[in-house]
UniProtKB/Swiss-Prot annotation:
The RNAP catalytic core consists of 2 alpha, 1 beta, 1 beta' and 1 omega subunit. When a sigma factor is associated with the core the holoenzyme is formed, which can initiate transcription. It comes from Chlamydia felis (strain Fe/C-56). It catalyses: RNA(n) + a ribonucleoside 5'-triphosphate = RNA(n+1) + diphosphate. Disulfide bonds: none annotated. This is DNA-directed RNA polymerase subunit beta. Belongs to the RNA polymerase beta chain family. One of its GO terms (cellular component) is DNA-directed RNA polymerase complex. Transmembrane segments: none annotated. NCBIfam families: PRK00405.1, rpoB.
């Protein structure tokens, strides 16, 4: 069987860890959200299940009616993803939810249809209205607690903390200049400022003694004589000291003891005092006790409420319910598992499952946070402030969580409606059932809005496989709940030490989004809390083990991590006593005995696209950024070619992007053609798997998707083998460009400013030819004036224009079209107007039809030409208008379909029976199997499975079987689940086919009778003005296509294919391109492909050795001869092979001209831009140029009749038609606009006509 070609490398040893699935971030998250394939009772409390459990049960206001959620059930998709794209519909499944309603009449259960939910394709994308979209993961500030510091204008450092919940009110505490702590709620600083002591009391710590006990250690001291005074004076009391008989107070908790106070206490025979250790009068808690206006729980509650809601009556009940609602009601305040995890970790609380499930705030949290804040103030070395840009404080919301939040808001909206309906329902006249009070609109409209309009749901970049892959791995800090592009500062955008191995430091867009949109590093994963983890090898006693530990940024802080390039011996021990390592974000030379972990691979630092750049370590970071971004813009070429110099990631990137077809199981190839491959399974040759290819489909960006088989009949395939190549892949490897023989030299000035000179030979060989596919759509609707009609019979159009249209008015496949050609003929009824008498007479003589329609045909727009490659027609069938012949044909068709459906079901049942037999026959039952509804024991523990028992199990559905977890039954459950899903899918497909035969395309929008889609393919050859680039950020525009005979040539007569400017290298500092040139030349001559992975590539010495081995010049420079004169150039020139890409900025899409066109409404000046059919702006500096030449008439013409002189425009048009040559300019509209603006300011400005 075909295998990806081996690449030669100088890498000492392979990575011990394979890359994870590169689109796992998308697939895993959405799978967890929907939990497809799990039984209702087995579902975990996450995703959609969690939302339903949170919102339900819903009770009516009088609590007489209760609506409970039981479970949800997802259907199977009606169409395949490809069919959804073809029809322009959403790839989704139905959502049905089972509810139980309890009211005065009894208990009723019902399954309610709740609309449809879009589901993810195997490639990690969604299909919404026929377009593939990606939901980008969002990086946001993690819920939890953050400690910060800021400098006051007086120079004091003020410490503060914020408790940020997942949902609910923020709680902030900050020191003021007097060392008092104030609490702010919801960031409204001025109005909601509450003394921390008041807030502590409002939480339930009523007495001063309770509060002191929370913050200080208490010690009992004896007071026996005046000798004890010296020890006690200046100490702080921890409890009130009073005479119980007379209730006389000698000292209050929090007071400082003086000699006088102690004398009074001694006189009153008080012998023991409780003292707060480490407390003094300057301690923030003691200061706040003195400052606090309240002295009890009730007073504190009322004071809290007064400050929170000034103007409202502060009753105890109101105050208590407000504080409960703000922080202790799980429906309104939720820290989430993440927030609780962060808070417990920071404050040193337990990390067990029970503690992490506490989602609301606790009193202990506030006390713990205040203690930590005071420790910071006191200068405790173990207390530290948080860096908000550290990845320990930023987390990722993946697609599942983003959609879960949308579902939550949709169901919360529905909850209100359900309550209202419960209250308004008239029980006397009707019976209440769940379906009558549940409205699915809330949920479906929210999902529709999210997928269609959200900033994070994006039209997938599908220029090439890498663009697609990167889009799914993208991280965005923008979007709802994220940052704002205008307000995001430098710190947020900057590379942080904690990004190592988690976020790529190179790949980010240039421009306003720099640093806000990033990409996941190659080995990174996202854990259950949403934090990015990266793998490390564990080091024990100086030995680097093969054990892998995935670590989050905060855990990594405590580890000393060696680089992957550290030298090891054959026993995996460090050979050197010191090595480069990282600790707390700093790099230093560490003693190898202190190292705890080691990097898995040098490429774990960078993202996939950056990892595709050979010799990345020799490129300047700014150019590497451009190189990463430009690989995503490379257009798939007609003839693909893998790079001679790669990095070893090409095959993996192609595989995980979904561009190529990969074998899903072992087997033998039985049949191959251009459209499909059939593989017979190895374990059972009667089971055959068909792999269908995508043929000439249009991608989102208009490029062509086409898959070609790589195997032959009789080939043995193994799971994971490449069966077919896709767009921009070659032999299963990514192939974005071409290996081109280049020379770095100036050539007649044509490569000035990074321009590129190419040989005509590349054009002749179709080296950079790409195929673009345009889709044109036309719909015929049922209008108020009558039905539109798709027809060949179009008024006032000659027969030769209609030559390529078929009988039905649709262009034939294979027709060559150019701008203005008709693709689909359509006539539309005209609105009836009052007719002149002679017209009415003509109508009476020649019949009604001819005049009351207008031509509304679909024509080819300017700038597009090519070949019609496909036509798709969708239409509804009218049951009543079918002829008898059509009805007979339909019946035959339906009969055949039913027969095929029954055959498929019997094949499926046979397969299922065989698999059951293979698993169970003659095996002992490890545990009893019980029928869930009847509680009958179907299989007794220890029973040996025979044919009869297996047949009994075959009749049951998975929902009805209760099986204890064990290996055998887990496999049985999966078998049953797959079988039931396949049955369901067969049934849905059968019903869809029946519906299609009877009703046509019922999915068409309301009012549409017929819809036609025409696909026009055009070949784009490389031409002057196209943008080209290498992988090192070396970009340029084709400036000249030179005949092969005129290009410089080598001594052996071989002509150079492309000439680059040598001045593009030194200042750009991307030497990677020069090393690639040399290594490419040596490898091409040797006839091999090489891989030079990031940071462990070919050393320079090895490249020179290879050059000498192949008989090439040792310095990589050769003499060239001028193709025009045949003379040798004076100096030697660097020549070699570089992998060059053609980017999607093609001149054909940009070139544009206008004679007349639309004008702006206000200024009456021509619009700008190709899309608006606009003109070129003749700006201020251009006017100066004409003024300098003194061309008065041309200047007047440009500023008036060619721009915004409305009457002059019309006159000049007339004079051109009449053949006259006169220019009479009028008043430009801009003058009128100026006058109106001045009048708008209240100035009475009027133009005056003055006689000369």
């Amino acid at each position: 069987m075909f295998k990806c070609p081996e690449r030669v490398s100088v890498k000492k040893k392979e990575d011990i860890l394979d890359l994870p699935n590169l689109i796992e971030i998308q697939i895993k998250s959405y799978k967890q959200f929907l939990q497809i394939g799990k039984l209702a009772e087995e579902r975990d409390n996450v995703g959609l299940e969690e939302v339903f459990r949170e919102i339900f049960p819903i009770k009516s206001y009088n609590e007489a009616t209760i609506l409970e959620y039981l479970s949800y059930n997802l259907g199977v998709p009606k169409y395949s993803p490809e069919e959804c794209i073809r029809r322009g519909i959403t790839y989704s499944v139905t959502l049905k939810v089972r509810f139980r309603l309890t009211d005065e009449t009894g208990i009723k259960e019902e399954e309610v249809y709740m609309g449809t939910i879009p589901i993810m394709t195997d490639k990690g994308t969604f299909i919404i209205n026929g377009a593939e979209r990606v939901v980008v993961s969002q990086v946001h500030r993690s819920p939890g607690i953050n400690f910060e510091q800021e400098k006051h204008s007086k120079g004091n450092i003020l410490f503060s903390f914020r408790i940020i919940p997942y949902r609910g009110s923020w709680l902030e505490a900050i020191f003021d200049i007097n060392d008092l702590i104030y609490i702010h709620i919801d960031r409204k600083k001025r109005r909601r400022k509450i003394l921390a002591m008041t807030f502590i009391r409002a939480l339930g710590y009523s007495s001063d003694a309770d509060i002191i006990e929370e913050f200080f250690q208490i010690e009992e001291c004896s007071l026996k004589s005046e000798k004890d005074f010296s020890v006690l004076v200046g100490k702080i009391l921890a409890d009130n000291v009073l005479d119980e008989a007379s209730s006389l107070v000698y000292g209050k908790a929090g007071e400082k003891l003086s000699t006088a106070m102690l004398k009074r206490m001694l006189d009153a025979d008080i012998s023991t005092l409780k003292i707060a250790l480490e407390a003094d009068e300057n301690h923030p808690i003691i200061k706040m006790l003195a400052k606090d206006p309240t002295d009890s729980y009730e007073a504190a509650l009322k004071d809290f409420y007064r400050r929170l809601r000034p103007g409202e009556p502060a009753t105890l009940a109101n105050a208590r319910s407000t504080i409960m609602r703000l922080f202790f009601d799980p429906k309104r305040y939720n820290l989430g598992r993440v927030g609780r995890y962060k808070l417990n970790r920071k404050l040193g609380f337990p990390m067990d499952e029970e503690s992490l499930s506490q989602v609301t705030l606790r009193k202990e949290d506030v006390i713990g946070a205040l203690k930590y804040l005071i420790r910071l103030k006191m200068g405790d070395e173990k207390a530290s402030i948080d860096d908000i840009d550290h990845l320990a404080n930023r987390r990722v919301r993946s697609v599942g969580e983003l959609i879960q939040n949308q579902c939550r808001s949709g169901l919360a909206r529905m909850e209100k409606i359900v309550r209202e309906r419960m209250n308004l329902f008239d029980f006397s006249s009707d019976t209440l059932i769940p379906g009558k009070i549940i409205s699915a609109k809330g949920l479906t409209s929210v999902l529709k809005d999210f997928f269609g309009r959200s900033q994070l749901s994006q039209f997938m970049d599908q220029t090439n496989p890498v663009a697609e892959l990167t889009h799914k791995r993208r991280l965005s800090a923008l979007g709802p709940g994220g940052l704002n592009r205008e307000r995001a500062g430098f710190e947020v955008r900057d590379v942080h030490a904690s990004h190592y191995g988690r976020i790529c430091p190179i790949e980010t867009p240039e421009g306003p989004n720099i640093g806000l949109i990033t990409s996941l590093s190659s080995f990174a994963k996202i854990n259950e809390f949403g934090f990015i983890e990266t793998p490390y090898r564990i080091v024990r006693d100086g030995v680097v083990t093969d054990e892998i530990e995935y670590m989050t940024a905060d855990v990594e802080e405590e580890c000393v991590i060696a680089q992957a390039s550290a030298n090891l011996d054959e026993y995996n021990m460090f050979t050197d006593p010191v090595c480069w390592a990282r600790y707390r974000g700093e790099a230093f030379e560490a003693d190898t005995s202190t190292v705890t972990h080691m990097d898995v691979s040098p490429k774990q630092l960078v993202s996939i696209v950056t990892g595709l750049i050979p010799f990345l370590e020799h490129d300047d970071a700014n150019r590497a950024l451009m190189g990463s971004n430009m690989q995503r813009q490379a257009v798939p070429l007609l003839k693909t070619e893998a790079p001679i110099v790669g990095t070893g990631l090409e095959a993996r990137a192609a595989k995980d992007s979904g561009a190529i077809v990969v074998a899903e199981e072992d087997g033998v190839v039985e049949y191959v053609d251009g459209y499909k491959v059939v593989v017979a399974a190895k374990h059972n040759p009667t089971l055959k798997r068909t792999y269908e290819f995508k043929k000439f489909l249009r991608s989102n960006s208009g490029t062509c998707i086409n898959q070609r088989p790589l195997c032959s009949v009789g080939d043995i395939v193994v799971k994971g083998d490449v069966i077919a190549d896709g767009p921009a892949t070659d032999q299963g490897e990514l192939a974005l460009g071409k290996n081109i023989l280049v020379a770095f030299m100036p050539w007649y000035g044509y490569n000035f400013e990074d321009a590129v000179i190419i040989s005509e030979k590349l054009i002749k060989q179709d080296a950079y030819t790409s195929i673009y596919i345009e889709e044109f759509e036309l719909t015929a609707r049922d209008t108020k004036l009558g039905k539109e009609e798709i027809t060949r019979d179009i008024p006032n159009v000659s027969e030769e224009v209609l030559a390529n249209l078929g009988e039905d008015g649709i262009i034939r496949i294979g027709a060559e079209v150019k701008p203005g050609d008709i693709l689909v003929g359509k006539i539309t009824p005209k609105s009836e107007t009052e007719l002149a008498p002679e017209e009415r007479l003509l109508r009476a003589i020649f019949g009604e039809k001819a005049a009351d329609v207008k031509d509304a045909s679909l024509t080819v727009p300017p700038g597009t030409e090519g070949v019609v490659m496909d036509v798709k027609v969708f239409s509804r069938k009218d049951r009543l208008s079918k002829s008898d012949d059509e009805l007979v044909e339909e019946a035959v068709h339906l009969k055949d379909l039913q027969k095929g459906y029954k055959n498929q079901i019997s094949v499926l049942k046979t397969e299922y029976r065989e698999k059951l037999g293979a698993l169970l026959l003659n095996e002992k039952a490890p545990a009893s199997i019980i029928h869930r509804r009847t509680a009958d024991i179907l299989v007794q523990e220890g029973t040996v499975f025979d044919q009869e028992t297996i047949e009994l199990l075959e009749q049951e559905s998975l929902v009805d079987l209760l099986m204890p977890p064990c290996d055998m039954y887990d496999v049985l459950k999966n078998l049953l689940s797959d079988y039931e899903t396949s049955l369901q899918r067969l049934e849905v497909n059968y019903k869809t086919e029946v519906e299609h035969i009877r009703e046509g395309d019922a999915d068409l929008d309301h009012g549409v009778i017929r819809q036609v889609k025409v696909y026009v393919a055009s070949k784009r050859k490389l031409q002057v003005g196209d943008k080209m680039a290498g992988r090192h950020g070396n970009k340029g525009v084709v400036s000249k296509i030179v005949p092969e005979a005129d290009m410089p040539y080598l001594a052996n007569g071989e002509t150079i294919q492309m000439i680059l400017n040598p001045l593009g290298v030194p200042s750009r500092m991307n030497l990677g391109q020069v090393l690639e040139t040399h290594l490419g030349y040596a490898a091409k001559t040797a006839g091999i492909h090489v891989k030079t992975p990031v940071f462990e590539g070919f050393p320079e010495s090895r490249i020179w050795d290879m050059m000498i081995e192949q008989g090439l010049p040792a310095d990589g420079k050769s003499y060239l001869y001028d193709g025009k004169t045949g003379e040798r150039f004076d100096n030697t020139v660097v020549i070699g092979y570089i992998y060059m890409l053609k980017l999607s900025h093609l001149i054909a899409d940009k070139i544009h001209a206008r004679s007349i066109g639309p004008y702006s409404l206000v200024t009456q000046q021509p619009l700008g831009g190709k899309a608006q059919m606009g003109g070129q702006r003749f700006g201020e500096m251009e006017v100066w140029a004409l003024e300098a030449y003194g061309v008065a008439h041309m200047l007047q013409e440009i500023l008036t009749v060619k721009s915004d002189d409305v009457s002059g425009r019309t006159r000049i048009y007339e004079s051109i038609v009449k053949g006259e040559n006169l220019l009479k300019s009028g008043t430009p509209e801009s003058f009128n606009v100026l006058i109106k603006e001045m009048q708008g300011l209240g100035l009475d400005v009027r133009p005056m006509v003055v006689d000369a």
